[in-house]
Amino acid sequence: MPRKGPVAKRDVLPDPMYNSKLVTRLINKMMVDGKKGKSQTILYNAFDIVRERTGKEPMEVFEQALKNIMPVLEVRARRVGGANYQVPVEVRPERRTTLGLRWLVNYARLRGEKTMEERLANEILDAANNTGASVKKREDTHKMAEANKAFAHYRW
């Protein structure tokens, strides 16, 4: 922890095409080896696929998908008297979006389609329809929190 107080949050610039900070954060999350241009191309192509398949604005579909992925509760390990308890805690808004974006990208990468554009587009569409691996991850996280409700009084 820093001695000079809390570290200031770095603000990302909105992306040029959709003028959204969320999209920029997704681009940054997908980026490998600093290749931001490639990451942008992949995302914009994925959004084109989403527009093609749904006929809706891709930003709306993406925001709905993210809303369906973002967790409300998670468990954190807390050591009490030599035993580790999984204590359910509420997820802060900033962490919610971060986890949502992380899960979206990770589970898109694990999909079987040929290109990353198709994988990402399909994962976004699945998440928007409340199906898919990233939504299952959120459900599992909530289930864990529900199962460990008894330890909620250990919250800090």
From Swiss-Prot:
Originating organism: Bacillus cytotoxicus (strain DSM 22905 / CIP 110041 / 391-98 / NVH 391-98)
SUPFAM superfamilies: Ribosomal protein S7
HAMAP family tied to this protein: Ribosomal_uS7_B (MF_00480_B)
GO biological process: translation
Protein name (database record): Small ribosomal subunit protein uS7
InterPro entries: Ribosomal_uS7, Ribosomal_uS7_bac/org-type, Ribosomal_uS7_CS, Ribosomal_uS7_dom, Ribosomal_uS7_dom_sf
Function, as annotated: One of the primary rRNA binding proteins, it binds directly to 16S rRNA where it nucleates assembly of the head domain of the 30S subunit. Is located at the subunit interface close to the decoding center, probably blocks exit of the E-site tRNA.
Membrane-traversing stretches: none
A Gene Ontology molecular function term of the record: rRNA binding
Subunit structure: Part of the 30S ribosomal subunit. Contacts proteins S9 and S11.
Family stated for the protein in its record: Belongs to the universal ribosomal protein uS7 family.
Keyword check for Ion transport: no
Cellular component terms (Gene Ontology): small ribosomal subunit
UniProt KW keywords: Ribonucleoprotein, Ribosomal protein, RNA-binding, rRNA-binding, tRNA-binding
Pfam families reported in the protein's UniProt record: Ribosomal_S7
